[in-house]
UniProtKB/Swiss-Prot annotation:
Organism: Rattus norvegicus
UniProt keyword list: Autophagy, Cytoplasm
GO CC annotations on file: Atg1/ULK1 kinase complex; phagophore assembly site
Function text: Autophagy factor required for autophagosome formation. Stabilizes ATG13, protecting it from proteasomal degradation.
A Pfam family recorded for this sequence: ATG101
GO BP annotations listed: autophagosome assembly; negative regulation of cell population proliferation; positive regulation of autophagy
Name the UniProt record assigns to this protein: Autophagy-related protein 101
Main location (coarse class): cytoplasm
Length: 218
């Protein structure tokens, strides 16, 4: 099975990390979630509805749409909070990345554990910039909003392509494809990881600093 991989890069101020990452992760999961499956008998089922809601950012001029699931939101906020803290405590230049991997399970015979086969991975490379003045922060608030809008549009365009998705499973195989542990929504199986690194390029950060500098010069 071929695994599709997408990479995004963002440059943000420290206080914008959480909102930017939540906007990206929630957007991806909005398009990779379904309502709960309700089986009548094997091969016959109905799918519940998925509620959505708008989220206004506090530190970015941006509003995104997410699945209306408090359980899913709490799970994402937990790992994003850990990533934000790791960035802040790294003592370096604030470089890191988060990966959202979708996978399906392949049952293995005892005593081997099930195999997890990835079919789509989203990686977001993040560079935190330090700003000196409130004027710079206000400009960054606007520019990050514009850039984030471009990223979200790109995500939606990628999601609209007719590429691989796991086939709808039978009732007995549902847990091999979907996360059935949430009460109100059913995302494809996923896992999120992050790392703090000094190996990322700084082209996005350079572009952001240039945008701020050019705006100040107007």
């Amino acid at each position: 099975m071929n695994c599709r991989s997408e990479v995004l890069e963002v440059s943000v101020e420290g206080r914008q990390v959480e909102e930017a990452m939540l906007a990206v992760l929630h957007t991806v999961l909005l398009h990779r979630s379904t309502g709960k499956f309700h089986y009548k008998k094997e091969g016959t089922y109905s799918i519940g509805t998925v509620g959505i809601q708008d989220v206004d950012c506090d530190f970015i001029d941006f509003t995104y749409v997410r699945v209306s699931s408090e359980e899913l939101d709490r799970a994402l906020r937990k790992v994003v909070g850990e990533f934000k803290d790791a960035l802040r405590n790294s003592g370096g230049d604030g470089l890191g990345q988060m990966s959202l991997e979708f996978y399906q399970k392949k049952k293995s015979r005892w005593p081997f554990s099930d195999e997890c086969i990835p079919w789509e991975v989203w990686t977001v490379k993040v560079h935190v910039v330090a700003l000196a003045t409130e004027q710079e922060r206000q400009i960054c608030r606007e520019k990050v909003g514009e850039k984030l809008c471009e990223k979200i549009i790109n995500i939606v365009e990628v999601m609209s392509r007719h590429e691989y998705l796991p086939k709808m499973p039978t009732q007995s195989e549902l847990d091999n494809v979907f996360d059935t542990g949430l009460r109100d929504v059913q995302p494809y199986l996923y896992k999120i990881s992050f790392q703090i690194t000094e190996a990322l390029g700084t082209s996005v950060t350079t572009t952001m600093r240039r945008l701020i500098k050019d705006t100040l010069a107007l």
